[in-house]
Amino acid sequence: MDAELAEVRALQAEIAALRRACEDPPAPWEEKSRVQKSFQAIHQFNLEGWKSSKDLKNQLGHLESELSFLSTLTGINIRNHSKQTEDLTSTEMTEKSIRKVLQRHRLSGNCHMVTFQLEFQILEIQNKERLSSAVTDLNIIMEPTECSELSEFVSRAEERKDLFMFFRSLHFFVEWFEYRKRTFKHLKEKYPDAVYLSEGPSSCSMGIRSASRPGFELVIVWRIQIDEDGKVFPKLDLLTKVPQRALELDKNRAIETAPLSFRTLVGLLGIEAALESLIKSLCAEENN
């Protein structure tokens, strides 16, 4: 029974984290209350109605099914989870019906191709009226990955001790990373003579060259950024490499204004259509 109870509670913790990863980022003034409610949801687990091992197994099966669904939805899989609990309640606290507990968690998992290990502490203080919980320490270890853009975000999540932001933002980051990779690969296959990926489809840049315009080159830099609140969004920039003679002949400053025009094009057509339009415009003569 004890082993099954422990497994049920571990599954509940995983489900609570995955549910948070599905939610949109809350407004700053909502964050504190929503975090507290999420921690409370993990522990408000009613065992009074369970009278046999069969009841536990039924509940365990239900939680495993829910965890599988949420893992499929978010792409986040928790492989291992362990917890140690230390009772910090003093005699004075006991007399006031206050309980203070420190939980030390370790878990490992992955979000698609990104593998992570987490070590974090949760301090719980409970009295007759309410239960408050807070992450007091967070250490994130990321396995070597193609996603170099994650390093700054991981440091910020550790500094803020924001476990929920880590899961939520990681989910959306990986979605954008996979979309960028698929888009670069698709354009390379469709326009093999014009598109080059010097660091492969997983990199953040794509080059466009034209055989009919030697020395003229466009480079798309597509970064995936995570802001201070954990919101994930793409940022695309256009860099131009042109011969000096072409710059001198560009009386309408089309080359100079190309980066701004490209951002406008992305806003109007969307990312993939804007990139393809750029390729076609540069390589119009080859296509004809």
UniProtKB/Swiss-Prot annotation:
GO cellular component: cytosol; inner kinetochore; nucleolus; nucleoplasm; nucleus
GO biological process, one term: CENP-A containing chromatin assembly
Compartments where found: Nucleus; Chromosome, Centromere
Modification Phosphoserine occurs at: S38
InterPro entries: CENP-P
Coiled coil: 1-71
Record Pfam families: CENP-P
UniProt keyword list: Centromere, Chromosome, Coiled coil, Nucleus, Phosphoprotein
Its biological purpose: Component of the CENPA-CAD (nucleosome distal) complex, a complex recruited to centromeres which is involved in assembly of kinetochore proteins, mitotic progression and chromosome segregation. May be involved in incorporation of newly synthesized CENPA into centromeres via its interaction with the CENPA-NAC complex.
Family in the record: Belongs to the CENP-P/CTF19 family.
PANTHER family given in the database record: CENTROMERE PROTEIN P
Assembly mode: Component of the CENPA-CAD complex, composed of CENPI, CENPK, CENPL, CENPO, CENPP, CENPQ, CENPR and CENPS. The CENPA-CAD complex interacts with the CENPA-NAC complex, at least composed of CENPA, CENPC, CENPH, CENPM, CENPN, CENPT and CENPU.
Protein name as it appears in the record: Centromere protein P
Organism: Homo sapiens
